[in-house]
Amino acid sequence: SGSGKSLILNGHVDVVPVGPEDLWSESPWSAKIVDGKLYGRGSCDMKAGLASGLYALKILKDLNFKPNGTVIFQSVVGEESGGCGTLANIIKGYTADGAIILEPTSLRLSPIQSGALTFRLTIPGKATHASMRWDGVSAIEKYSLLHSSIIEFEKHRHDVYDVEFYASKERVAPINIGTITGGQWHSTVAESVIAEGRLGVFPGESNENARKEFE
């Protein structure tokens, strides 16, 4: 710590679900080292980044070097679902003049980043027996039309917004549907579908504007 400008080294310890473990060449929880590389869930995103931050602090300590400003190391949870861990640190007053997010970037500086909002869509239908499906309204068929509109909406937003530093201008703020649930029985017209997803927010765009456009 010191009176100069402060710096945060930030990384997360949570990971997304592993999926079917039989599709992995090694157990996602093994941390097995093969040809000098460690394999396992979160080894790249982002235990490696956390390790590099801790090692940087260790080097400073080994050299008995004291920076002019405070250096804060943050190991947080909840990054994969909105950043609640980092937000908790901010609310508690752990802020600084600058921050380095230790995410994997193929050793390239990334001075800008898009944001994201999560959403849930509920699509109503009208249930009836499959033999009389024309008397009902399939929520699944309604959702298929909505999904096509979401894809077109994503393209439209990338045509409107122009962002610096991105090599692929059409991949800045993607929209993804991550889960879909619906229907009760194979012989019943689906009376509802629930879809959950992620809405990309462009750098410099407010959450409010992104939500308004999506709605």
Residue ranges and their predicted role:
Residues T118-E215:
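Metal-dependent amide/peptide-bond hydrolase catalytic core
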Residues D14, L23, E80, T105, ...:
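Catalytic metal-binding/acid-base residues of hydrolase active sites
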Residues D14-V18, G78-E80, K126, F202-G204:
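Short coil/turn motifs at secondary-structure junctions
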Residues S1, I112-S114, T188-E191:
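Short glycine/proline-enriched turns and hinge-like loops at secondary-structure junctions
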Residues S6, P28, T70, P174, ...:
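A residue-level signal for beta-strand positions that form part of recognition/binding surfaces
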Residues S1-R41, D62-P67:
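Acidic/His- and Gly-rich active-site-bordering loop/insert found
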Residues L38, S43-E152:
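Fold-level recognition of mixed alpha/beta catalytic cores in primary-metabolism enzymes, strongest
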